[in-house]
């Protein structure tokens, strides 16, 4: 895969593909399962796949979130590599002529006024002008036969379709269904802004849309009835601040009084400070089915030629390490404690007086330190680890290291160095890896992904018991505060933030024994092997 940043390099590569079918997937990065569904379809239908990653300043208003929009270049690179993308085009604003300081004097593409009278356009003046300008630029640079856009951004889709039609651009715009989580929430990069409570509130957007759809399916085609049904559902969630709820024609975006053939029921609402949009097509074809929990709990078949990898992620204190060790022992797989690697670098930095905000020194430390890991003699004992020949197995579990490890792990250079080592160890499969971004970044192609979680109180108690066993006394309240602070750091960092992979199986360990959690994962692994007919792997 090539990662290109300049127009010249992109043009040179595209020219070499002359005579082949090229597909374009335009994105703003911070990739998730919605983007990956577009990429997979593009790869199925085209000889070459180009993914653009560009957080477009021209489509953000003065008080919007351009400066804090999620960016995860390392994670995006790994996902694109795993998905088989040929080229990622990731220019900066200057390369695209989109520097806000000088953009006022550039050529703009103005969508038809009739498409800007409803939905998001009145609330985001200039937004779709910025979208249309950059999309036209990308179509001109890549000259794809096909370009893939998600139905979730329905107004954008309608505008791009009209743009291509009016300007006679020889590109087929391919609409792709909205991809949702099990509770209906549409995948969005802005979902990262949501707290756990806000995440539950956000799920009511889909419930409201579905209520309107069901009302239409029951035989009432009137906009009044459909909107009233959706609105009644929204009123059950007062935490939502609805910006608009509208029923329009999917192509013209003009308001409908009734749905005769097709309609677009669309919503925008604020959950806390986060603005979310969603929509449903009201059409005879019906609504795309939600992913069922039973389906999401069935892992995909393992990659040919390697034993399956198990990726276990989750917040501090969720029980990842002890569970991963035990699962690896039961299945006779290699266990790799990635967290111990970050702890070792943190401990060394503290010992040597390296400032924890000095990214350059920390990166150099990670690159130069020789780390040696060895599984403990039993599943009950932690991984033994040596840093430059000195065993630091116990030292890296100190409260001071625990306090600072997430800050060190957030340094891009440190992550890059350690992830390279982790990938070398796990590339042949047959391993259990645990951490915070194994399934989303280190091994996004892992065959089995698990996300363990537990309440702050439960995790604090577990940590207290660990420390007491080591002869250390720390109050429960202090541990709770440390865990909450670490959760914030891990989930809000820009580089590989803590989040479940889209296809991860979530296990809440609050009311489960360790043995019960282990049993769940072992059964899922064996189920994976049975589905693939992989008896030749000779696991236990």
From Swiss-Prot:
**Database matches in Pfam families:** Cytidylate_kin, Pantoate_ligase
| Compartments (UniProt record) | Cytoplasm
Q: Which UniProt keywords apply?
A: ATP-binding, Cytoplasm, Kinase, Ligase, Multifunctional enzyme, Nucleotide-binding, Pantothenate biosynthesis, Transferase
What are the binding positions for ATP in this chain?
A: 28-35, 150-153, 179, 187-190
GO biological process terms held by the UniProt record:
nucleobase-containing small molecule interconversion; pantothenate biosynthetic process; pyrimidine nucleotide metabolic process
Specify where the region named Cytidylate kinase lies, as residue ranges.
281-540
- The UniProt record gives the binding positions of (R)-pantoate as 59, 156
InterPro entries listed in its UniProt record: Cyt_trans-like, Cytidylate_kin, Cytidylate_kinase_dom, P-loop_NTPase, Pantoate_ligase, Pantoate_ligase/cytidylate_kin, Pantoate_ligase_C, Rossmann-like_a/b/a_fold
Q: What is its main location?
A: cytoplasm
Q: Where is this region: Pantoate--beta-alanine ligase?
A: 1-280
What are the GO cellular component annotations? Answer: cytosol
Q: Which residues form the active site?
A: 35 (proton donor)
The residues that the entry says bind beta-alanine are: 59
| Pathway(s) annotated for this protein in UniProt | Cofactor biosynthesis; (R)-pantothenate biosynthesis; (R)-pantothenate from (R)-pantoate and beta-alanine: step 1/1
Query: Where are the stretches annotated Disordered?
Result: 288-307
Q: What is its EC number?
A: 6.3.2.1, 2.7.4.25
A GO molecular function annotation here is:
ATP binding
Q: What does this protein do?
A: Catalyzes the condensation of pantoate with beta-alanine in an ATP-dependent reaction via a pantoyl-adenylate intermediate. Catalyzes the transfer of a phosphate group from ATP to either CMP or dCMP to form CDP or dCDP and ADP, respectively.
Kindly give the PANTHER family that the UniProt entry links to this protein. CYTIDYLATE KINASE, CYTIDYLATE KINASE/PANTOATE-BETA-ALANINE LIGASE
State the similarity comment: In the N-terminal section; belongs to the pantothenate synthetase family. In the C-terminal section; belongs to the cytidylate kinase family. Type 1 subfamily.
Protein name per Swiss-Prot or TrEMBL = Bifunctional pantoate ligase/cytidylate kinase
Q: From which source organism is this entry?
A: Synechococcus sp. (strain JA-3-3Ab)
């Amino acid at each position: 895969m090539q990662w290109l940043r300049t127009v010249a390099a992109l043009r040179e590569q595209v020219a070499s593909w002359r005579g082949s079918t090229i597909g374009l997937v335009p994105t703003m990065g911070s990739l998730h399962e919605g983007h990956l569904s577009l990429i997979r379809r593009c790869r199925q239908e085209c000889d070459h796949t180009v993914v653009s990653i560009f957080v477009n300043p021209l489509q953000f208003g003065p008080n919007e979130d351009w400066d804090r929009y999620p960016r995860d270049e390392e994670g995006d690179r790994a996902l694109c590599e795993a998905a088989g993308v040929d080229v990622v085009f990731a220019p900066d604003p200057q390369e695209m002529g989109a520097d806000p300081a000088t953009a006022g004097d550039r050529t703009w593409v103005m969508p038809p006024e009739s498409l800007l009278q409803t939905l998001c356009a009145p609330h985001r003046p200039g937004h779709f002008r910025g979208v249309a300008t950059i999309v036209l630029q990308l179509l001109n640079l890549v000259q794809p036969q096909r370009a893939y856009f998600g139905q979730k951004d329905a107004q954008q889709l309608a505008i791009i379709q009209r743009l291509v039609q009016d300007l006679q651009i020889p590109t087929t715009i391919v609409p792709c269904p909205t991809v949702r989580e099990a509770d209906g929430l549409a995948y969005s990069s802005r979902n990262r802004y949501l707290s756990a409570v806000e995440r539950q509130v956000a799920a009511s957007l889909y419930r409201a849309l579905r209520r309107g759809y069901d009302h239409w399916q029951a035989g009432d085609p009137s906009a009044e009835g459909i909107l009233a049904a959706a609105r009644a559902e929204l009123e059950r969630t007062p935490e939502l601040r609805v910006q608009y709820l509208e029923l329009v024609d999917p192509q013209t975006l003009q308001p409908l009084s009734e749905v005769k053939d097709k309609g677009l029921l669309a919503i925008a609402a604020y959950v806390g400070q986060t603005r979310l949009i969603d929509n449903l097509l009201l059409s005879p074809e019906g609504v795309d089915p939600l992913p069922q929990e039973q389906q999401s709990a069935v892992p995909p078949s393992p990659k040919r030629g390697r034993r399956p990898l198990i990726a276990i992620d989750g917040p501090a204190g969720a029980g990842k390490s002890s569970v991963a060790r035990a699962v690896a022992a039961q299945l006779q797989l290699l266990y790799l404690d990635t967290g111990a690697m970050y702890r070792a670098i943190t401990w060394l930095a503290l010992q040597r007086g390296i400032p924890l905000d000095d990214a350059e020194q920390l990166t150099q430390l990670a690159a130069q330190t020789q780390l040696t890991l060895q599984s403990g003699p039993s599943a009950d004992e932690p991984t033994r680890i040596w840093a430059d020949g000195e065993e630091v197995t116990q030292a890296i579990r100190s409260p001071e290291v625990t306090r600072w490890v997430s800050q060190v792990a957030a340094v891009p250079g440190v992550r890059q160095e350690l992830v390279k080592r982790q990938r070398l160890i796990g590339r042949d499969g047959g391993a259990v890896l645990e951490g915070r971004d194994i399934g989303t970044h280190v091994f996004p192609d892992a065959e089995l992904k698990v996300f363990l979680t537990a309440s702050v109180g439960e995790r604090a108690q577990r940590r207290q018991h660990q420390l007491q066993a080591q002869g250390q006394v720390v109050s429960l309240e202090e541990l709770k505060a440390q865990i909450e602070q670490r959760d914030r750091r891990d989930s809000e960092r820009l580089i590989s933030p803590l989040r479940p992979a889209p296809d991860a199986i979530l296990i809440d360990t609050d009311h489960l024994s360790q043995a019960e959690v282990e049993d769940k994962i072992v059964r899922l692994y064996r189920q994976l092997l049975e589905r693939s007919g992989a008896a030749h792997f000779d696991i236990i």
